[in-house]
């Protein structure tokens, strides 16, 4: 069973359907006790950083999410679910993130020929932290975002993407995996990535 966090700002049904297509059941919840008891956890997200982290805190979900990550059980963040893991985001002001990873989230500042938001299919380049993800450099995933993460520790960068310059497309640290792109919208390669998450061994800390 995979648990998907509901804080009213994620494309929950499409994530749930993608999980179920990998042959694993998925539940959607905003209940802290269910999050704490989860076997595997997905934090999705679509929208603005400040609104999202505000909803997480308003619903008292910050501690159970951080405790889950610390437990060593498999965790997947998607889009805003990646960005909120960092210390600060600057979308519509300065907002404190979950602080699970050091670094911040900043806006694209690109030449006029590059449209923002970065929307559509783009290729990724695999780094050392992503070597065991079963992804090859040049694989395309679907992106929709105007901000990107800047990890303080470069060793957590699993995948990068080039859009007017290189940016972090995914991070990996132990049981934690998070992507800027949407695997649930990325057809076969995205579904394979989700299946890999759904079947990853659980190593509880």
UniProtKB/Swiss-Prot annotation:
Keywords: Amino-acid biosynthesis, Cytoplasm, Glutamine amidotransferase, Histidine biosynthesis, Hydrolase, Lyase
InterPro entries (alphabetical): Class_I_gatase-like, GATASE, Imidazole-glycPsynth_HisH
Keyword Protein biosynthesis recorded: no
PROSITE patterns: GATASE_TYPE_1
Active site per the UniProt annotation: 79 (nucleophile), 182, 184
Pathway connected to this protein: Amino-acid biosynthesis; L-histidine biosynthesis; L-histidine from 5-phospho-alpha-D-ribose 1-diphosphate: step 5/9
EC numbers, comma separated: 4.3.2.10, 3.5.1.2
Subcellular localization(s) per the UniProt record: Cytoplasm
Any single GO BP term: L-histidine biosynthetic process
Matching Gene3D superfamilies: 3.40.50.880
Disulfide linkage: none
Signal peptide as annotated in the record: none
Catalysed reaction, written as an equation: 5-[(5-phospho-1-deoxy-D-ribulos-1-ylimino)methylamino]-1-(5-phospho-beta-D-ribosyl)imidazole-4-carboxamide + L-glutamine = D-erythro-1-(imidazol-4-yl)glycerol 3-phosphate + 5-amino-1-(5-phospho-beta-D-ribosyl)imidazole-4-carboxamide + L-glutamate + H(+); L-glutamine + H2O = L-glutamate + NH4(+)
Cellular component, GO annotation: cytoplasm
Molecular function terms from GO: glutaminase activity; imidazoleglycerol-phosphate synthase activity; lyase activity
Quaternary structure and partners: Heterodimer of HisH and HisF.
UniProt function note: IGPS catalyzes the conversion of PRFAR and glutamine to IGP, AICAR and glutamate. The HisH subunit catalyzes the hydrolysis of glutamine to glutamate and ammonia as part of the synthesis of IGP and AICAR. The resulting ammonia molecule is channeled to the active site of HisF.
Stored NCBIfam families: IMP_synth_hisH
Name recorded for this polypeptide: Imidazole glycerol phosphate synthase subunit HisH
Natural source organism: Rhodopirellula baltica (strain DSM 10527 / NCIMB 13988 / SH1)
Recorded name of the encoding gene: hisH
């Amino acid at each position: 069973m995979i648990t998907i966090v509901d804080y009213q700002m994620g494309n929950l049904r499409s994530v749930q359907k993608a999980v179920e297509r990998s042959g694993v059941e998925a539940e959607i919840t905003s209940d802290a006790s269910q999050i704490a008891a989860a076997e595997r956890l997905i934090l999705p997200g679509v929208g603005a950083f400040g609104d999202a982290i505000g909803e997480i805190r308003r619903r008292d979900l910050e501690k159970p999410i951080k405790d889950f990550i610390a437990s060593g059980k498999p965790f997947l963040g998607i889009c805003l679910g990646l960005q909120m893991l960092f210390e600060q985001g600057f979308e519509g002001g300065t907002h404190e993130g979950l602080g699970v990873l050091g670094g911040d989230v900043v806006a694209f500042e690109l030449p006029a020929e590059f449209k923002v938001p970065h929307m559509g299919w783009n290729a990724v380049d695999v780094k050392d932290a992503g070597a065991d993800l079963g992804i090859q450099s040049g694989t395309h995933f679907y992106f929709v975002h105007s901000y990107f993460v800047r990890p303080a520790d470069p060793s957590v960068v699993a995948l990068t993407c080039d859009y007017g310059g290189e940016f972090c497309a995914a991070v990996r640290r132990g049981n934690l995996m998070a992507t800027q792109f949407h695997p649930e919208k990325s057809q076969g390669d995205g579904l394979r990535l989700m299946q890999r998450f759904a079947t990853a061994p659980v190593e509880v800390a």
